[in-house]
Structure formats: C-alpha cells, structure tokens
C-alpha cells in the first residue's frame, strides 16, 4: 500500500482560542509555499489537523520538507481507506505483513469520531487484532511500548491508518506574530537570529546592505543563499538589497576612523527603520550578541539605537559564539556563512573601533553629512526579490552565470 497523505498535527495553535483558525490558515499557506516544488500535492486544513494529500508525490521527500516548518507538532503518513470492516481488515493485514520481522510486537489503537460506524473502538481493536493474528500467526501483541502501534481512526469521510509519529518543529506558524525586518549581514549570527524569530511566528523580510564594487556579487549571492535556507521554516521571504556604497564612502572620507563602525550601524538602522515603516513591519531583528565585537557593547548599542524608537529584537544577544554556531550548523547556514566574501561591516573596518562611543561625539560627526538625503536615496534604490524554497541549484554555477 502507498501512503495517501501526510496528517499534520498542529502545535501551540490548540491554545490560541478565537485566533485559532487564523493561525491554522497561516500554517496552511506556509505549507503550500514550502511544498511549491510538488505541484501535485494539495493541502486541506480543519480545526483539528491539516491534511497534505500526496496525489502520487514521494512521501519521504514531502515529510523532509515539512519537518522544519514551524507550527507543526507532529506528522504521520497515513493510508486513507473506505470505512468498512472488510476493507479495514485487508488494509491492516497488508500493512502489518509489510512491517513484520521475527519477534515483532504490536497493538491496534482505534478511535472513532463517526459514532454511526458499526463497531465501537473496543470491538474494532479486537476485530483488527484478530485479523493480524490470522495473517501472521507468530506475531505478538503487547499493550505497553510495542514495536508498532497501528492507529486506526474512523472519521465521517473515511478511515485513516498510520503507524509512524514524526516529531515536527513546534513553535508558531511564520506570520502569526506579525512581520519584522531582519538585518542580514551574511555572517553566522544574523541567520540564526532570523531562524529564532521565525520559530516564534515572526514573518521576516531580509534587509541586506551591498556596497559594490567593495562588496562582490559573491557576497550578495551568499546572502540570498542564506535567505533561501531560512525559507524552509515557513515559506517565501522577501529579500531587500540596499545600495550602501555612497554612504560608506561618505563616512570613510568625513569621519574619524574609530567611529566608522558606529556611524555605519546608525545609518543601517535608520534605513532599515524607514523600510520597515514603508513595508508595514512592526520590529527590527538583528544578530547582535553582547560583547562579541566593538559595535555590540552596551555603550555602542545605546549610541546606535538612539536613531530609532522601533523595538529591536536580538534573539542571540545572550548566547556564546559556540552556542550560535551550534544552531547555525543545525539549520545548515553555517557552511554558507563562513564563505570568505567581504560584507559592508568588514570592508572599511577600523583597526581600533570605539567600544564606548559618546553620543554627543557621534552626533557631532554625523552633522557633517546630509543624513536625510543619504537615507532617502538608499531607500529609493532598494531592490526586492522574493526568495522561495525551491530545490536549490549549485551556488557557484549561479554566481558564474550572474557574472557573465
């Protein structure tokens, strides 16, 4: 027998009261995005669960695509059959025969929401269990911790059989908690910050600053590849490329070297905030980890944050670098993040950046610039690309094509 669908059990959605269907519909849309590479698959949601109808698609590939999606508590590949006793007996015998090995233990666990069905759960357990013994005389029944628990569910529309329970990613469906702008540098920390925000239901748009010719097409490709890795957790992500060359050249020529990083980060934050307002997001997200680099001391954060009153979420702020790396490896962003391409935060990095910048000094140096004009031109020049979770192509080949 072939699996007919994947049954998705909802995670924290069961606690969301009046918003429950909104959250479920959000999860359904995210699943559809993640499974866009499987056009034959259809998705149907109810208050209790979501049904992913395979329609001939490979069940293992679909399961692997669903496992990282936030909002899913668990997955079970199921066989959908007619809800008649003879059909159920034949199905149970076929399934258990395919699983049988010497010494295997099993139990049947039935439940019914269709109370018009001819057998109650207890009688159905006995009938189907007897059918298994008829087909496999040497198999053993075991009520506690058997090797196989064959679940049989009688619903209004059909009967469903399953014997696998696969753990989902948990969390909330991406988008259920609103939208935030992720400042995505291309390093190790910011993709992890994006991942942790996605887990709590925040839809992210990735804001990446590019300064050609100082930053290369490879650096831009790297940031897009990181964004694509993040799409596995909740579907499509808007990638926003910000032209930053003019601003970085201005800062380099007009400000003291020790303040380059502070001024650069203040401009980045202003621009991200302007894009956030334009695109109706609620928060800014970044990968700052306290004390990790000069711009991430409390004094630096205070001086940089002074340009906005928008909430800034820092999911990795209290993590050690090794903790962040561990998550990056788990979500498959680490190998991309360590590719040796320069980004906007490294190309003009001073040898001795200020770790305790005085706000009065920062504002005095900033008075040398046309701040509003620089920000407006950067925002006007953004390029937005929708990144999807389609099957990835070789990044090097893609980069060569772009260069040609």
UniProtKB/Swiss-Prot annotation:
Entry-linked InterPro entries: Rossmann-like_a/b/a_fold (IPR014729), ThiI_AANH (IPR020536), ThiI_fer (IPR054173), ThiI_N (IPR049961), THUMP_dom (IPR004114), THUMP_ThiI (IPR049962), tRNA_STrfase (IPR003720), tRNA_sulfurtransferase_ThiI (IPR050102)
EC number: 2.8.1.4
Domain named THUMP: residues: 60-165
One Pfam family named in its UniProt record: ThiI
Domain of life: Bacteria
Keyword annotations from UniProtKB, A to Z: ATP-binding, Cytoplasm, Nucleotide-binding, RNA-binding, Thiamine biosynthesis, Transferase, tRNA-binding
Compartments, record wording: Cytoplasm
Binding, ATP: 183-184, 208-209, 265, 287, 296
Enzyme class of the recorded protein, top EC level: transferase
This protein's pathway: Cofactor biosynthesis; thiamine diphosphate biosynthesis
Cellular component GO terms held in the UniProt record: cytosol
SUPFAM superfamilies xrefs: Adenine nucleotide alpha hydrolases-like, THUMP domain-like
GO molecular function: ATP binding; CCA tRNA nucleotidyltransferase activity; tRNA binding; tRNA-uracil-4 sulfurtransferase activity
Catalytic activity: [ThiI sulfur-carrier protein]-S-sulfanyl-L-cysteine + a uridine in tRNA + 2 reduced [2Fe-2S]-[ferredoxin] + ATP + H(+) = [ThiI sulfur-carrier protein]-L-cysteine + a 4-thiouridine in tRNA + 2 oxidized [2Fe-2S]-[ferredoxin] + AMP + diphosphate; [ThiS sulfur-carrier protein]-C-terminal Gly-Gly-AMP + S-sulfanyl-L-cysteinyl-[cysteine desulfurase] + AH2 = [ThiS sulfur-carrier protein]-C-terminal-Gly-aminoethanethioate + L-cysteinyl-[cysteine desulfurase] + A + AMP + 2 H(+)
PANTHER family for the chain: TRNA SULFURTRANSFERASE (PTHR43209:SF1)
Family: Belongs to the ThiI family.
Role according to the record: Catalyzes the ATP-dependent transfer of a sulfur to tRNA to produce 4-thiouridine in position 8 of tRNAs, which functions as a near-UV photosensor. Also catalyzes the transfer of sulfur to the sulfur carrier protein ThiS, forming ThiS-thiocarboxylate. This is a step in the synthesis of thiazole, in the thiamine biosynthesis pathway. The sulfur is donated as persulfide by IscS.
NCBIfam families from the UniProt entry: tRNA uracil 4-sulfurtransferase ThiI
Name recorded for this polypeptide: Probable tRNA sulfurtransferase
Organism: Streptococcus equi subsp. zooepidemicus (strain H70)
Taxon lineage: Bacteria, Bacillati, Bacillota, Bacilli, Lactobacillales
